[in-house]
Swiss-Prot record:
Keywords: Carbohydrate metabolism, Glycosidase, Hydrolase, Manganese, Metal-binding, NAD. GO terms for cellular component: cytosol. This is Alpha-galactosidase. Homodimer. Substrate binds at residues 151, 287. The keyword Hydrolase applies. It comes from Salmonella typhimurium (strain LT2 / SGSC1412 / ATCC 700720). PROSITE patterns: GLYCOSYL_HYDROL_F4 (PS01324). Its EC number is 3.2.1.22. The gene is melA. CDD domains: GH4_alpha_glucosidase_galactosidase. Mn(2+) binds at residues 173, 203. GO terms for biological process: carbohydrate metabolic process.
Amino acid sequence: MMTAPKITFIGAGSTIFVKNILGDVFHREALKSAHVALMDIDETRLEESHIVVRKLMDSAGASGRITCHTNQKAALQDADFVVVAFQIGGYEPCTVTDFEVCKRHGLEQTIADTLGPGGIMRALRTIPHLWRICEDMTEVCPKATMLNYVNPMAMNTWAMYARYPHIKQVGLCHSVQGTAEELARDLNIDPTSLRYRCAGINHMAFYLELERKTADGTYVNLYPELLAAYDAGQAPKPNIHGNERCQNIVRYEMFKKLGYFVTESSEHFAEYTPWFIKPGREDLIARYKVPLDEYPKRCVEQLANWHKELEEYKTAERIDIKPSREYASTIMNALWTGEPSVIYGNVRNEGLIDNLPQGSCVEVACLVDANGIQPTKVGTIPSHLAAMMQTNINVQTLLTEAILTENRDRVYHAAMMDPHTAAVLGIEEIYALVDDLIAAHGDWLPAWLRR
């Protein structure tokens, strides 16, 4: 083994995300001298990231080197870790297209990056590019581990392990650890006092056990306290990011009905189910505080904030940041040093969750050490939770089959099975919507879709 790893970042123009991941990396002793290869097709964004990463490295006392690439294969050459974070088609034009076309057909969305027509189109745009990374990794860094942050996570991860089973990869999200911190904040307790066991699928995993440590060192079930706080109007607390549109009512109401708390946000969860967004039901939107068109609004705000932050970073002498909640540096450190850690990752269901389809993509706790990323067996999850997840897995199954077999019919079938879409549109309307989305996206989609 070399004395320091090579970390390749595909999509390095995502400057703020790069900053968070590499800020963590540079504060790990075993990774301080890593070779960081930044790759992006946008040379301007790439150079901006280079400036930020150099200042991060210097501020942390890291001694590695940085190289910048617009050629993917060159960036991947001899990599040990490959971090992937990009959005094919960006906010403009593709995200705008997903929202505007669906709205014309009477389908409202909130985020549209995981399921539904928005998630389906994003998967069709994205998976061919992920496959190209797998091709290049096979050729120039076959032993590397891919840390994938690209949505729609389940469909992307599934499509990669189906076609490139030899590539070591894990799909990463921050909803498990992020929601745990949110719930601790809602109850005014220290997040480090929590202990939990979580399982499911990406953006629809549930805390099967959620406990807090008491003064005498024993653990107690946190769910009764959480429910009491919600009923008393003491939870949820205002959005930590100051976003007044996202009030987290949907998840708490689902918690009351299901008995378990889901990991992904209310604005996400509202569009994974058939109950919250319906034409002419403004009462539901008002009652559950569902933020329609949230993702486009967020993109505009984040872009403005990013430009402001970037200017500050470019003029700053040093950049000091707090550790993030992302798992990437934890995984790299554990694989590189052998120091064991536990993370939550999206992986192939091979006997992990008994009552979800084998081969589907599930989110479970994984032990990480010198032996690799080792998912842990969960067993059987509560039947009502599995039933809800299955409605989402249906879409993932059909879309993955569509792109693996180049079968346009399965794209329609995936949209038909989407819980939210099916609750709003008839069959012919769904077909017309898919046709319009494919036409509107044009060359952003694979050529076989337009044959």
